[in-house]
Amino acid sequence: MRMTLAVHPEQYTIHSFSPNAVLPSEVFAQDMYFIGKTQEGLSLVISSEMELDSLEQEPGWCCFEVLGPLGFSMTGILSKVSGTLADEQISIFAISTFDTDYILVKNNRLKSAIAALKKQGYHIIESKDEV
């Protein structure tokens, strides 16, 4: 089965906050965001268009979405994608949801990531017009 990944047109920033930080309500009005919290800190991935006062931030990430549906019985999807990108020395930031996986790569490595994935037989949708 040939996997399809869609490239989101937005760029994203990964923010770091203290574990007890209160996020602005505007965060929750965004179309897409991801929050992770541990005892050490709170991480937020959100569109770079939203400026936030975080402890640290890493801007310039592009996002691949693995198009599904993906069942919990499907194994190795993230491993295969990350392995393909690792072979090309492309760092990733991976996020999984109940429905699918998201793989973020730095903007300056996006073209290389697309080429590497296509070479391995992945179908890449690069604009909403292709959906």
Over which residues does each language-model region extend?
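Regulatory modules associated with amino-acid/nitrogen control
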Residues: 1-88, 112-131
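A generic structural motif
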Residues: 41-46, 100-106
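A cross-kingdom feature marking solvent-exposed beta-strand/loop segments within repeated
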Residues: 88-103, 109-111, 128-131
